[in-house]
């Protein structure tokens, strides 16, 4: 536990010294603000044009940020030889990975918090801000998305040998889960028998954190009816009091699984080394 | 014989007495059924009901005017399967009655079969249809409130607020209808005017089937499945209505036109619905000056042609428009807030057109499961790639650069302040964190 705390604080130290973190923060904050200014008419409440665009902006930026920061942090340890040094200490893999995850989450979430803080207060001052519930929902969405992708980032950082590899895999994962997802699914499922489509899409959605978080948020914002009659039960279910805890549960399982896989791989590497 | 003469004499006396008091035929006995009072009245007489509770059902088979003394204190209770009030005679007026008819049943609470009926200021609590009009013309329903009375009935099993079949030239003005199946349902009924009504939490607010020249003006609807549903109709005017918050149901719309022709849809406000304006299989309609805002989809056009869609304002919608097989419409000079045009000659219209990508519509028509990708970043990306047959897309030829109407609504400030404060707190926290980390480092 102490080790984990040590690693986490070390990670935060490195993270807040990292110029990448600040450039990501600037990028995120500037985009949030400019979207707010573009949509100055009225306010932002519920699932509307503005919150839809915000949602998509977060979907573009946050996974990429999380994947890059996370995987670079791990591969950096390998490349710079820090890991070899650390392995001489009595430091377990689990405290190391978990500490890394926690430290990186702190850095990433403060980036998100800064972006949201800026747009929330600026929107208020400009008189075209968010409705509080929508703001809360979008913030929750961004946090969830960051944590999900940070989990994947740990796995990528474990798999990749250096930063270049990490970058390649990170961009690949990002493109696959965020941009190419509908195209791929439409192409693949188009060949399947009609009745298989919905179960297949449902299963695959649970495997894609971007889609999962997006759909959860769209329904929570009151936009569930856009999903059409096919998903009526989902809509009811997500909006029930059980929706949020179960989503949090799925998230925990997901991140836990990613970290566990990273742990397994890391341990194997250690055994060989 | 003597008995009947006596009765007539008594009635005449009563009428004379009543006239001397300025109000004819009084209901003497509270426990008396209303039917007996009605039976005793002369055709054309005015009955003024004393405060109290009366027993239904009642059949009015001669022209009468039934009013109440004062306001809101005359209640007609019906516990039978029959309509609480049946109007079979022409030219009957009923005003001010509170009718409670809570039994769930097929029959309506008020059944109108006579022409020129006037129902004014009623308060109806129904377990069936509130007011049903059958083969009767030229009636009027005003200032009437219709509520659903029974508990635990599914929306689909409820009755309609007002249900008109084969009733022409009716007027429905300033009524309030809540929690029913369809607020005002009109079938095979021409030249009706529906104005100033308020309909909430029902399936369809105003529903026209096989009607001509219906006028739907200045009505308000919220939290219904669909505000105004105009199906298989001609020359309907839907003007100045406001429908909002109809987004809960997967089939929700603000205003729907289906198989509707040569109609006008103007100056309406549709706010926060699943689909603002939905037009399917309709031709020759004019959709103008509507305010379409904060809907998930602004306007949806399916298999519709020869419509004119102009000077509407689309703001804050998640998707401006979706269209499929709707090529020959005249779409011009609308304002779309998601579209950034170029206006080189300064006439206020964009020189580049705004084409509505049909990809998503076509995709989800074939496989509804893909509806899940609505406005997902990947879908937006894919739509950007898909550009084939662009000249056949539904296109606004010259979209407006600035909104045509003055902004009449800035969202409520409620909750904004809270967001501002939350934002400042977040900023403060991250600021402190950065500062603290920096200090630790140095």
Predicted segments, located by residue:
Chain B
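Bacterial N-terminal signal peptides that target proteins for export
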Residues: 2-9
């Amino acid at each position: 536990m102490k080790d984990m705390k040590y690693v986490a604080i070390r990670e935060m130290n490195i993270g807040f010294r990292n110029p990448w973190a600040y450039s990501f923060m600037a990028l995120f904050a500037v985009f949030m603000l400019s979207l707010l200014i573009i949509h100055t008419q009225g306010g932002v409440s519920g699932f509307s044009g503005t919150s839809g665009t915000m949602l998509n902006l977060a979907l573009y930026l946050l996974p990429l940020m999380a994947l890059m920061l996370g995987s670079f942090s791990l591969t950096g340890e390998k490349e710079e030889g820090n890991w070899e040094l650390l392995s001489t200490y009595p430091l377990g893999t689990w405290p190391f990975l978990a500490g890394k995850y926690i430290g990186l989450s702190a850095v990433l979430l403060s980036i998100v918090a800064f972006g949201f803080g800026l747009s929330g207060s600026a929107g208020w001052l400009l008189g075209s801000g968010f409705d509080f519930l929508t703001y809360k929902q979008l913030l929750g969405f961004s946090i969830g998305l960051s944590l999900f992708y940070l989990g994947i980032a740990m796995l990528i950082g474990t798999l990749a040998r250096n930063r270049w590899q990490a970058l390649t895999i990170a961009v690949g994962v990002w493109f696959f889960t965020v941009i190419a997802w509908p195209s791929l699914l439409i192409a693949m499922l188009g060949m399947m028998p009609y009745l298989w489509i919905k179960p297949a899409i449902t299963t695959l959605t649970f495997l894609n954190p971007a889609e999962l978080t997006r759909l959860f948020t769209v329904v929570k914002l009151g936009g569930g009816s856009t999903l059409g009659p096919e998903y009526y039960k989902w809509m009811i279910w997500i909006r029930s009091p059980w929706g949020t805890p179960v989503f949090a549960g799925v998230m925990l399982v997901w991140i836990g699984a990613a970290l566990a896989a990273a742990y397994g791989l890391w341990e194997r590497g250690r055994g060989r080394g | 014989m003597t008995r009947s003469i006596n009765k007539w004499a008594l009635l005449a006396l009563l009428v004379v007495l009543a006239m001397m008091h300025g109000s004819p035929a009084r209901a003497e006995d509270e426990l008396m059924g209303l039917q007996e009072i009605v039976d005793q009245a002369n055709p054309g007489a005015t009955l003024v009901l004393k405060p109290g509770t009366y027993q239904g059902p009642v059949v009015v088979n001669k022209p009468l005017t039934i009013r109440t003394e004062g306001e809101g204190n005359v209640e007609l209770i019906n516990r039978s399967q029959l309509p609480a009030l049946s109007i079979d005679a022409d030219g009957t007026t009923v005003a001010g009655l509170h009718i409670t008819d809570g039994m769930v049943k097929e029959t309506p609470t008020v059944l109108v079969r006579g022409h020129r009926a006037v129902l004014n200021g009623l308060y109806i609590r129904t377990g069936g249809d509130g007011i049903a009009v059958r083969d009767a013309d030229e009636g009027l329903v005003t200032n009437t409130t219709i509520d659903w009375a029974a508990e635990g009935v599914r929306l689909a099993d409820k009755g309609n607020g007002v249900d008109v079949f084969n009733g022409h030239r009716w007027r429905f003005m300033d009524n309030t209808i809540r929690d029913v199946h369809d607020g005002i349902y009109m079938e095979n009924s021409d030249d009706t005017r529906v104005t100033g009504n308020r309909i909430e939490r029902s399936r369809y607010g105003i529903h026209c089937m096989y009607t001509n020249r219906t006028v739907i003006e200045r009505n308000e609807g919220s939290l219904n499945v669909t505000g105004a549903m105009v199906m298989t109709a001609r020359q309907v005017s839907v003007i100045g209505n406001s429908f909002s918050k109809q987004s809960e149901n997967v089939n929700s719309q603000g205003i729907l036109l289906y198989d509707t022709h040569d109609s006008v849809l103007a100056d309406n406000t549709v706010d926060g619905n699943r689909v603002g304006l939905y037009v399917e299989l309709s031709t020759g309609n004019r959709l103008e000056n509507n305010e379409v805002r904060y809907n998930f989809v602004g306007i949806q056009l399916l298999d519709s042609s020869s419509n004119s869609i102009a000077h509407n304002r689309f703001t804050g919608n998640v998707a401006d428009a979706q269209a499929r097989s709707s090529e020959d419409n005249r779409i011009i000079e609308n304002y779309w807030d998601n579209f950034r045009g170029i206006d080189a000659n300064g006439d206020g219209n964009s020189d580049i057109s705004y084409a509505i990508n049909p990809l998503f519509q076509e995709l989800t028509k074939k496989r509804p499961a893909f509806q899940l990708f609505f406005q997902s970043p990947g879908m937006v990306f894919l739509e950007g790639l898909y550009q084939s047959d662009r000249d056949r897309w539904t296109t606004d030829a010259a979209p407006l650069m600035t909104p045509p109407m003055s902004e009449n609504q800035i969202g409520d400030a409620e909750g904004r302040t809270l967001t501002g404060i939350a934002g400042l707190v977040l900023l403060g926290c991250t600021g402190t964190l950065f500062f603290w980390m920096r200090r630790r480092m140095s």
